[in-house]
Design a protein with these regions (language model features):
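Transmembrane alpha-helical segments of polytopic membrane transport and secretion proteins
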Residues: 1-36, 275-287
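Transmembrane alpha-helices
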Residues: 89-105, 140, 194-226, 273
Length: 287
């Protein structure tokens, strides 16, 4: 009983030390605060948005900021603030969907393959190499040309080419864990393979996977906005940041604020996720 209590205390101390290490940097705290603000804006967009983001009223197009329209209106008379708030919902939900698919596909496969080794591991690695060699633009173009451009198809494109990166990292970490002394002790103690993989190996590699995922969200947001900007992703009139940039590119000289608002939000959220990811990675490296 005393031994278990001591182990729990030691585990709690290690976890507390880890989180202190993660949030030691002011940049990490700032990144987390910004991410929380954007997440809340996305969740409560229907409540916070002063107008319908799809409502067109050309009689008030390109209106300057006012009490009714805090950031003004776009070229079709739509409320810019409302579209930005709803845009955060689309950008974050699409990004987290891609992330969830890639992690759930990439990590479990190589956990088993890396632990078992042999031919299975070799085959999985060759498959990973093939997917790592796929350029995301060509895949997105092929899918858009075959079944049409949409948000769902963009998620599919990004997931197809992104899962291999997580799989490769998870495999390398699994091989490291596999060769550690505690693995021999677990096997000698009669611990089953499934328990070793999911209770011990997965738990130990998870912080590094989370760190990569946090930093990759920024890249995914940029990809979604970029592909939507060139017409291979989310389609108009959806209030997505890349679409807003695309719609306003003709007004860059006369009404630069139309491009400034979505552009600055993309920059801020990408930096926030990068800062947060760096903090998690630093905590993982020093754990």
């Amino acid at each position: 009983m005393g031994s278990r209590r001591k182990q729990k205390t030691e585990k709690s101390m290690i976890q507390n030390l880890y989180w202190k290490q993660v949030f030691r940097s002011p940049k990490t705290k700032i990144g987390l605060m910004v991410v929380i603000i954007f997440a809340l804006a996305a969740i409560f967009a229907p409540v916070l948005a002063p107008h319908d983001p799809l409502l067109v009223d050309v009689s008030i197009k390109l209106k300057n900021p006012s009490a009714a329209y805090p950031l003004g209106t776009d070229q079709l008379g739509r409320c810019i603030l409302s579209r930005l708030l709803w845009g955060s919902r689309y950008s974050l939900s699409y990004s987290f969907t891609v992330l969830l698919i890639t992690v759930c596909v990439g990590v479990p496969i190589v956990l088993f393959a890396g632990y078992v080794g042999g031919k299975i591991d070799s085959i999985i690695m060759r498959i990973i190499d093939v997917f790592m060699a796929m350029p995301v633009f060509i895949v997105a173009l092929a899918i858009a040309g075959t079944v049409g451009a949409s948000g769902a198809h963009l998620i599919l494109s990004l997931s197809v080419v992104s899962w291999a990166e997580y799989a490769r990292l998870a495999r390398a970490l699994t091989l490291q864990e596999k060769n550690k002394n505690y693995m021999t002790a677990l096997k000698a103690g009669g611990c089953g393979h499934a328990r070793i993989i999911f209770r011990h190996v997965l738990r130990n590699i998870l912080p590094s996977v989370i760190a990569l995922a946090t930093m990759e969200i920024g890249s995914i947001i940029l990809s979604i906005a970029g592909f939507s900007f060139i017409g291979l992703g989310v389609q108009a009139p959806t209030p997505e940041w890349g679409i807003m940039l695309s719609d306003s590119k003709s007004y860059i000289q006369t009404y630069p604020r139309l491009m400034f608002y979505p552009g600055i939000l993309i920059m801020i959220i990408v930096l926030a996720f990068n800062y947060l990811g760096e903090g998690i990675q630093n905590g993982t490296d020093k754990k």
